[in-house]
Design a protein with these regions (language model features):
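Conserved beta-strand hairpin/beta-sheet module of binuclear metal-dependent hydrolase folds
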Residues: 1-47, 127-145
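Structured loop/turn residues at beta-strand edges in well-structured enzyme cores
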Residues: 49-52, 98, 114, 155-159
Length: 160
């Protein structure tokens, strides 16, 4: 089963929890990590998720309300972080201690029970990506900041 929960939205910080799987095998993805680390910990606790229960982080773009505590949280919990090359080049955090993974437009990311499909969007950032998430039965489109809906964006979200 595919589930999502907004942990924060807006200029004070964006974070979305996406979960896939049954009660025994659950994959958890954090899309954006724009909150402060204590606030993120508290909101994960409210959702019944331990910080170490996150399997991956996907950063959509380099703006502070999306990237916030991503590096500190990833390093503390040893969680891989996916972002575009352009996003990584735009931030002042070159070292993710081997946890950085490069996400590319239309290249699938396999997290076991959860598959991600990043896609480019128009936005005032260096190389912003949004994504769809699927568990094989359902598909969720995650769209945070978007300049406007292009034909490509609509194509990528078809079926969500």
């Amino acid at each position: 089963m595919l589930r999502f929960r907004s942990l924060g939205s807006g200029s004070s910080g964006n974070a979305t929890l996406v979960e896939a799987g049954n009660g025994v095998h659950v994959r958890r993805l954090l899309v954006d990590c724009g909150l402060g680390i204590r606030q993120l910990d508290a909101r994960l606790a409210q959702a019944g998720v331990a910080p170490g229960g996150i399997d991956a982080i996907f950063i959509t773009h380099e703006h502070g309300d999306h990237i916030g505590c991503a590096r500190a949280f990833a390093l503390r919990e040893r969680i891989p972080v996916w972002m575009s090359h352009g996003t990584h080049a735009a931030i002042d955090a070159p070292d993710f201690d081997g946890l950085l993974r490069v996400a590319r437009d239309a290249e699938s990311i396999d997290l076991g029970e959860l598959q991600l499909q990043p896609f480019t969007v128009p936005h005032d950032a260096r190389e912003p990506l949004q994504l769809t998430c699927t568990d094989g039965a359902s598909t969720l489109g995650v769209l945070t900041d978007l300049g406007h809906a292009t034909a490509y964006v609509l194509q990528r979200l078809a079926g969500c």
